[in-house]
Amino acid sequence: MTKPTLHHLTLTDSLQTGGQRQLAWWQWQHPACAQPEHVVLAVHGLTRQALDFDVLAQALAPHRRVVALDVAGRGHSDWLSDPARYAVPTYVADTLALIQHLQPRELSWVGTSMGGLIGMALLGSGAAQARALVLNDVGPTLEWLALRRIGAYVGQAPVFATQDEGMNHLALLHASFGAHSPEQWRALSLPMLRPTTNGWRLHYDPAIAQAFVGMPQTMDQAAHDAQQVLWALYDAIACPTLLLRGAQSDLLSPATAQAMTQRGARATLHTVADVGHAPTLVQPAQVEVVRDFLLSPVAP
């Protein structure tokens, strides 16, 4: 097993109190890695954190250097002074700074939900180039009711008396991840909890919910315009792309997933049975699909 190591990148940030902040990232670097100059960069979903990718990283580490980011306000990364900056443009700039720090000869991207949006923005804009892209249950069109569902819980800041209480809360909240063993739920949940003076809290800044404040009941013109921008970014992506979709996902519709196979990157679609939003990339069959795609010589 390759033990992940925690690293920090200091970012100069004039908008942050103190003028700088720390961006945390984890690395799985196998001593006998076949291609350490090829980095697989994995970026998590809205309320998640980098260690979500541990199982996938273990499978890839003998072949690639694997890095996963704690996006600003999550995990071990600093919280932002201004909650309005919890948005994709900030995350894109941060991730680009990390890529420049890592200096990979080749880059592959794995993005779950929000992490996929960041990847589309980076690659579609030409700010970064990748050998291969994996989009996990995300696309240019996101279902509005699902966004409202997510917005309803993301700003909460519960405190749990025990770790077990926190883990039970997360297992219920993320039931759409599909069936997992108790050990798998524990591995997915423990990094999500932080000790406090009176119990345990979730790892992220509750202010990441800023983008959901005042969200209208139905899609407005601003949301429609943002959707068109995302499609334009997706259409500009040229690298081989694998699209995973949970068969029961309420965020990525079957119609959007099919459209993504016909335009832009012309993604290869893999549907994960008995899973909603989003596949965890923990189950062996999910890991195998992603690993085989990223290691395939046909993803030049």
Model-derived segments and spans:
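Catalytic histidine-centered segment of alpha/beta-hydrolase-like enzymes
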Residues: V275-P284
